[in-house]
Structures are given as structure tokens and as C-alpha cells.
Amino acid sequence: MKKIYYLLSLLLVVCFTSCELDNYEAPNINLVGKVVYNGRQIYVRNNQVTFRLYEPGWELSSSTYMDVQVAQDGTFSAGVYAGKTYKLIRQNNLGPWVNHTVNDTITVNNYHGEVIEMPVTPYYLLDDAAANCNGRLVTASCKITEVTPGQNIEKVGLYVGRNIIVDDVRNLGEGGYKETNAVQAGQTVSLQVDLSGFSINSTNTSLPQTGFVYARMGLKVTGIDAMIFTEPFKLAFSE
């Protein structure tokens, strides 16, 4: 009999716990934002850069903050609760910009859906970007503008891919990108990628049947994994 009472009690505890979990309210709004420098949106590799998001009042630990990934166009989004206050933390050495030694945190008070701007100071900017495709020869150029002195340029590259998500990792592979390390601040860099050796089919390392590819340029600073990029360009190629 005691064993039966014990089992019934245990069953009730499980039921009440399940009800509490079922009644847990899910986030009801997306906190949205973008990475900017003087109002200008900063482009990066898709989902490489992250910020930490947490709600004040909790001890900051891996179980109380959320890693928010930044898309290639510099935007980010995370599910939160409307009307609450949150903090966004920049992490050192994860982006192509200067580490914030004084204030690395943005406080978002009483959030109700407004677009949050995360200000950063890049080491370099890629200005006056342009790209075209003549037949199957992709040509792109940009001007290297130094924002923060003291950091060497490791490389500048042109990357061509099958879709709009294109960078130094996501591209057509061998023959689908061109890189150079002979670059100085203030210089206009022009690079070309010849696609004539690629076939047209559905594999990741071939040209798409749509007749379009995407290309953009990127710059890597020595000692920083994350690159800064131009916007992607949609280019038609000849079959």
C-alpha cells in the first residue's frame, strides 16, 4: 500500500512539473538590430560574428546569456520578451573592428520592436565597391579606406558563389575566388575571377542553372579571423 501511495505521489509531481513547463511563456517578440559605423551598415561573413544577449538581474554565465549571430548584411535577431530590458555585449576579437575597452555593452530598455544599432569602429572600410561579369569573367573593385591605424592588411579577396550567401568560406571553391596580399590603405583594388572552367549543374562547385552568380570582396586584418566585406552583387554570366 505504501508503495502505491509513493507511486501516486510521484506521478502527481511529474504531472505538476509537466504543467509548469507547458505554461512557460515563449519569447513573444524578436529583438532586431544591425551593426553600424557612423550609420553605415557593416557586412561580415554570415553567422561568424556573435554578440551576447542577456537580461539584467541574472548572474552572467553560459546558461544565462544567448549568443546572437550576425548575418552577412550585418543584421541580427533574437527572440525576447516585449517590455523587458536587455544587454548586448560585444566580444573581443570576434569582429573586424576595434575592441571596446571602456564600454562593450549596449543596454536596451523596455524593448518593443525598434531596430537596435550596434556601433563598431572597423579597422578598414571597403568603399566605392563595384562588380560586373563580361561573359564569364567576373571583375570587382573597391577602395581600401583606413579607419583605425596600426593594423596590417593580410589579404583582400574576391569571392564568387551560387547564391547571395557568399564569402571566403562559401564560394565556388578552387577557381571561384581570387586573393591578394599586395594591398595598402588608400589603394583601389581590382580583382578578377574567370568562370570559364566551371560547368553548369546543381553541385556546390558548379555554376547554377539560373544564369546568375553572386560576388563580393572582403578584407582580412592580420590576427583577426573575421573579415569585413562589401555587399554582394548579383551578376549574369553567359552559358
Predicted regions and their residues:
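Bacterial Sec-dependent N-terminal signal peptides
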Residues: M1-Q41
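Short, acidic Ser/Thr/Gly-rich low-complexity loop/linker segments typical of extracellular
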Residues: G57-T75
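Beta-strand-rich modules
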Residues: L195-M227, E239
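Short strand-edge motifs at loop-to-beta-strand transitions and within beta-strands
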Residues: G74-A78, D104, E114-I116, Q187-V193
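Structured interaction patches on ligand/partner-binding surfaces of diverse proteins
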Residues: N93-P119
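Short Pro-Gly-centered beta-turn/loop motif in secreted/extracellular proteins
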Residues: Q72-K87, N92-N93
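Short edge beta-strand/loop segments characteristic of extracellular beta-sandwich folds
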Residues: V32-V36, T139-V147
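Short, ordered, surface-exposed loop/turn motifs in non-cytosolic proteins
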Residues: R40-S61, Q151-K155
